């Protein structure tokens, strides 16, 4: 009998990659659940990517301690959920001058087979309607947009 941490799921060589970009200090649990279901069904690697906006007033590579302190617990929680679901995970942290710039930088250096775009009714929580339209028009691969319903079954059960 093994005690301790479960071994991370291993991706098959050349496995598809499912990108889930997010920002604003939050990843909706319903989006995370959907991403893990899709990744499991496709035999894909789940790639949660926290996007950090770097103001023009500082260098792009400047240390952003506060933003990283917000991002890391979210990425670690997503990794743990993926590990518990038996889904391979490869988390990312990407910087840019805007959310679009950060995504463009990520797309320039990595291959993704599908993108699951979290959409929130609260634009302060991440992508606004202009970002969403831009992503749908410029994404290098199949892109799904998911906006969880308010008052969903999950929310009612959690109360």
Indicate where each model-derived feature is located:
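Extended, non-globular alpha-helical segments
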Residues: 1-11, 63-71, 78-79, 83, ...
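Small/aliphatic-rich secondary-structure junction motif
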Residues: 7-65, 90, 138-149, 159
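A conditional alpha-helix N-cap/helix-loop micro-motif detector
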Residues: 28, 71, 96-97, 125
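Well-ordered alpha-helical segments embedded in enzymatic catalytic cores
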Residues: 31-34, 74-77, 102
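Charged docking surfaces used in two-component/phosphorelay signaling
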Residues: 93-102
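CheY-like receiver
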Residues: 38, 102-106
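Gly/Ser-rich helix-loop-strand patches that form or flank binding pockets
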Residues: 1-8, 34, 108-159
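Amphipathic coiled-coil/heptad-repeat helices and related helical stalk/stem segments
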Residues: 28-32, 99-100, 128-129
